[in-house]
Structure formats: C-alpha cells, structure tokens
C-alpha cells in the first residue's frame, strides 16, 4: 500500500487534516471555534466553550488520527514510511485543505504521532505537559516546554532520525504558537478552563 514515502506522506496528511474540533462542535451546535477564544480549532479552545466532553473528544480524535497514520504506515511499509506519515499527519492538522490551510496548533497530533513512532517519548511529553499545566495553568506554555525536550529525549534514546524529525515538528509547533508566545510575555494569555 505504501510503495514510497510520498504516498505515506499523503496518507498521513489526509488523516491529519480531519478537523475533529470543528466537526464535533458543529454537531453539538456550538458556535464556530474560529470566532471564539484563540480562534484555534483544537481541544483547548473547545474547552473554552465550557463543553468538557467535547474538548476531551477533540483531544482524543486529534491525537489518534496521528497515531493511526504512523502505525498503519509502519506496519505496511516500515520506519521510513512511518516518518513520512508523521510529517504528513502533523502538517495536515496545521494546514488542512478543508479549512483553506488554516488549522490547529498541533499539540494533540504531535503527541499522537510521537505515540505511534516511539511511545516512551510520548509519555515523557505528557508528563512534562501535565507538570507545567498543573503549576501554571497555561496550556500553551506546557506544550512549548514539553516539545523542546522531545528531540533531546529521542536522541538520548538512540533515535537520531526521529530526533531530527521532531526538531522540525517542534519548530512548526512553536511557529503556530507565536501569538501565544506574545501573549505569555504580555501576561494576557488565557489559562486552562477559562471561558471565552
């Protein structure tokens, strides 16, 4: 099914581009996510609507689409295809064709592809995210700090190719969080659980 990395990348992109936050909130009759809070289509912004169940479902969907893309590519065509699917799924979430290439910030999908490629690093990411989130209640800061450690952890575990790939993904994640970074420095970033 995956004769080369390009097909695996395209497969990953299509799975990654499914906008679960938009789909679930529309089904639930909630207003357009892009018009509230941060304008993001991910779970943190869904949480700002006050719908915790929808936020959890969005988080799970955005994470598992990344995991599915990587695991399917890995099983059918090996690690090279899995890496291509990793990049494709992440870019699909960030720049989905269905939403005119204006997607989410990628945290859940980052965790999902990491889980599929090397699960111990995904657990470490989640542990760091939870620690920072518990102490600061800033979702964005939690993701930024956890993502910084991921390439280092992958390198330390003996996976330099994965480390390089996730260094690229981390740069993209930070780019998508540039407005959050500005708000963090300005002291105006929204905290976890705050409604729009």
Swiss-Prot record:
Its main location: membrane. It is an enzyme of class 2 (transferase). It comes from the Bacteria. It is a multi-pass membrane protein. GO terms for cellular component: plasma membrane. The keyword Membrane applies. One of its GO terms (biological process) is phospholipid biosynthetic process. Pathway: Lipid metabolism; phospholipid metabolism. Keywords: Cell inner membrane, Cell membrane, Lipid biosynthesis, Lipid metabolism, Membrane, Phospholipid biosynthesis, Phospholipid metabolism, Transferase, Transmembrane, Transmembrane helix. Its EC number is 2.3.1.275. Pfam families: G3P_acyltransf. NCBIfam families: glycerol-3-phosphate 1-O-acyltransferase PlsY. Catalyzes the transfer of an acyl group from acyl-phosphate (acyl-PO(4)) to glycerol-3-phosphate (G3P) to form lysophosphatidic acid (LPA). This enzyme utilizes acyl-phosphate as fatty acyl donor, but not acyl-CoA or acyl-ACP. Probably interacts with PlsX. This is Glycerol-3-phosphate acyltransferase. It comes from Nitrobacter winogradskyi (strain ATCC 25391 / DSM 10237 / CIP 104748 / NCIMB 11846 / Nb-255).
């Amino acid at each position: 099914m995956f004769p080369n990395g390009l097909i695996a990348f395209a497969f990953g992109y299509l799975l990654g581009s499914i906008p679960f936050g938009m789909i679930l909130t529309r089904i639930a009759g909630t207003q357009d996510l892009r018009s509230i809070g941060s304008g993001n289509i991910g779970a943190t912004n869904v949480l700002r609507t006050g719908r915790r169940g929808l936020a959890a479902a969005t988080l799970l969907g955005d994470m598992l689409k990344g995991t599915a893309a990587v695991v399917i590519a890995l099983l059918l065509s090996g690690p090279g295809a899995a890496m291509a699917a990793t990049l494709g799924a992440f870019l699909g979430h960030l720049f989905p064709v269905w939403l005119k290439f204006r997607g989410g910030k990628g945290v859940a999908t980052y965790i999902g592809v990491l889980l599929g490629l090397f699960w111990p690093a995904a657990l470490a990411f989640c542990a760091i995210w939870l620690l920072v989130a518990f102490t600061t209640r800033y979702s964005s800061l939690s993701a930024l700090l956890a993502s910084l450690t991921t390439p280092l952890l992958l390198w330390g575990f003996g996976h330099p190719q994965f480390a390089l790939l996730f260094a690229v993904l981390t740069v993209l994640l930070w780019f998508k969080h540039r407005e959050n970074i500005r708000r963090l420095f300005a002291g105006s970033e929204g905290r976890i659980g705050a409604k729009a």
